[in-house]
Amino acid sequence: MKQRTIAKNVDIVGIGLHKGVPVKMRLEPLDSDMGIIFYRSDAGVTIPVKKEFVVDTKMATVIGKDGVVISTIEHLLSAIYAYGIDNLRIVLDNDEVPVLDGSSAGYCMLIEEAGIKELEKSKKAIKIKKEIEITTEDGKRVTLKPSDRIVYDFEINFEHPAIGKQKFHFDYSIEEYKNNISRARTFGFLHEVQYLRSIGLAQGGSMENAIVLDKTKVLNPEGLRFDDEFVRHKILDAIGDMALLEYTLVGEYDAVAGSHHLNHLLTKKLYEDEANYEIIDLEEASSEASVFEMAYSKVES
C-alpha cells in the first residue's frame, strides 16, 4: 500500500469560529514523506501537524510556532485522516480553519473534488502494542488499545434532556465515516456561547455552524441530523486529534467524556515509551494493509 495525497489544488472560503473573520484556505498535494503541514501565508510560517506543536487544547486543538498559531484544526484533520491522506499542505491567510457547517462533511466534499493520488513510497501506520490510558478524578477517560482493526468507541453523559447518555461504536472505513460521522456538527450551550462572545470568542458561531441548546432543547429549527449527533461529533473530533500521531492508527480508541486536552495527553503518553507502539510498513504488513484496502475500497470504487 502506497502513501496518498490529493490529485490537485482545491480552494475554499469560510469564516473562523472564534474570530468570525473570513479565511481563504487551499489544499495542495505534497510528495511522499512530507506529512501534513499548515502554512500561514499572511505570516510566512509553516507548522507541521505534530504533537510537539500543540499549544492549546481548551476550546479546540491549536498548533503554533514562533508565536504564530492555527486554531480549530480538528474537523479538517478528521477528514484528512479518515481519507487516508499522508501528505498535504494546507495554506491559510488567517489563524483559524473555516468552520463551514460545524461538521467535516464539507471537507470530505473538498477532498473528493481534489481526488486521491497514490505516491511512490509505501504507507506507514502506527500500531498500538500496549494499552495506555489517561484518566481524571471526575471519571473522564481516554484509552488506546491493541487491535488489528481501527475502532473508535465513545460515551458521553450530559445532564441535559436533549443529550443524556449516548454511546457510539465506529468501525473505520471511509464510507462509514462519510455517512455516519462527517455530518455530525459541533455543539454548544446558549449560556456558554453568550459568555464566549462577551470575552471575544465564538464571534463566528451560529446555528448555521453548530447545534445550539438552551436549558431544555435544541434551538436549531432543522433539529438534529442524528438522534445521537452529539457523541458522533465527539468521534469526529477524536479522529482529528489522532492525526497528531503523524501515522494512520491501527488500534482501538475508547473514551468516556474525552476531550481535546485528554487526547493530546494520550498521544504524548503513547510516544513516551517505544514499547507502546510499532511503526509498520503497509507494503510489508499484509494483514494490516488489508484493513485499509477494505476501508478505502467502497467509496473509491
Swiss-Prot record:
Cofactor needs: Zn(2+)
InterPro entries: Ribosomal_Su5_D2-typ_SF, UDP-acyl_GlcNac_deAcase, UDP-acyl_GlcNac_deAcase_C, UDP-acyl_N-AcGlcN_deAcase_N
Residue positions binding Zn(2+): H75, H233, D237
Catalytic activity: a UDP-3-O-[(3R)-3-hydroxyacyl]-N-acetyl-alpha-D-glucosamine + H2O = a UDP-3-O-[(3R)-3-hydroxyacyl]-alpha-D-glucosamine + acetate
Record pathway: Glycolipid biosynthesis; lipid IV(A) biosynthesis; lipid IV(A) from (3R)-3-hydroxytetradecanoyl-[acyl-carrier-protein] and UDP-N-acetyl-alpha-D-glucosamine: step 2/6
Biological process per Gene Ontology, one example term: lipid A biosynthetic process
GO molecular function, one term: metal ion binding
GO CC annotations, alphabetized: membrane
A Pfam family it matches: LpxC
Disulphide bridges, residue numbers: none
Active site residues of this protein: H260
Enzyme superclass (EC): hydrolase
Keywords: Hydrolase, Lipid A biosynthesis, Lipid biosynthesis, Lipid metabolism, Metal-binding, Zinc
Enzyme Commission designation: 3.5.1.108
The keyword Nucleotidyltransferase appears for this protein: no
Family in the record: Belongs to the LpxC family.
Function of the molecule: Catalyzes the hydrolysis of UDP-3-O-myristoyl-N-acetylglucosamine to form UDP-3-O-myristoylglucosamine and acetate, the committed step in lipid A biosynthesis.
Name by which UniProt lists this protein: UDP-3-O-acyl-N-acetylglucosamine deacetylase
Species of provenance: Aliarcobacter butzleri (strain RM4018)
